[in-house]
Amino acid sequence: MKVYKRLYELLGRGYKPLKSARLIKRGKDYYIGITLQKAVKEKKIKKPRYVINVDLNVQRNLACIGIFEVDWEKRESKLYGIKFVNGKLLRLVYKRDYLFEEIRKKQRQTGRSPQVGDNSRLWKKVNNLNRDIALKVAKEISDIAREFSEKGEVIVVFEKLKGLRGRKGRSKKLNRKINFWMRRKIQERVKELGLEEGFGLDFVYPHYTSKKCSKCGYEGERFSPSGSKALFLCKKCGYVVNADVNAVFNQHFLYLSHLLNGGGKARPVVRVGTSLKSPSREGHNLSGVPKATTTFFYISSLLSTF
């Protein structure tokens, strides 16, 4: 009988096994499932040194992560770096989408539901891939939070998930359900890791974060000149930036305004005309963050309560 190293790692970190266990059969193999538990105290963070804003895409870039360092005395926020979670993880997304398309083809040919025959087998693979992707994205986010927790208190901020709205077309509705499930799974896993690692988790309502220019505040639009990546173009100032990065900036501004107003109603606190420097290849090295492409931007956002 094989005993996985992961079990010893968890036991070494203070986890204790429950008395009950269960026997699991997968194919021709049998496994013993053991539930471990650990008592932790949730950490209340009111003035974090680092705010990590996360925009979950789960398609093009699985996640766009902005790491911001906050100086509460000077009321100044500085962007430490931007990281895209994609790379090898996107291969799992492509594999999942391929299987998903196979399910659709078989449904059109046979008229069978996903719970019958080959469709059921393929659907199990899709579910396993979704779970694997969600857990790995959550680990990427948590690795960054844990690294910066060594320097000061950290809060990871996600956009508040909205309820699913009905749309015409079964395929679109199903895609939305899958994406909603993945976002929720990622957030739940990051929360679990945060309780253990000591960093906080919070949410912000996505109030026009993807539609407004993070430089001047005017409304803009997305476009894809090469067909591979989405950019944001401001109709007023002409500012062009990666659309996910623009959303992360706006999300951060909203959350900082929430913190500076003592948890009150969020309102813009970044002065109109705040400069955003162009992307640079130079920057801090986010060590300990594997399998990802990192692009750095810099911003010094002057914060005021007006």
From Swiss-Prot:
Zinc as a keyword of this entry, yes or no, is yes
Keywords tagged on the record = DNA recombination, DNA-binding, Metal-binding, Plasmid, Transposable element, Transposition, Zinc
Q: Name one GO biological process term.
A: transposition
Does Transferase show up as a keyword for this record? no
Which positions are annotated as binding Zn(2+)? Answer: 213, 216, 234, 237
Give the similarity note: Belongs to the transposase 35 family.
Q: What is this protein called?
A: TnpB-like protein aq_aa05
The species this protein was found in? Aquifex aeolicus (strain VF5)
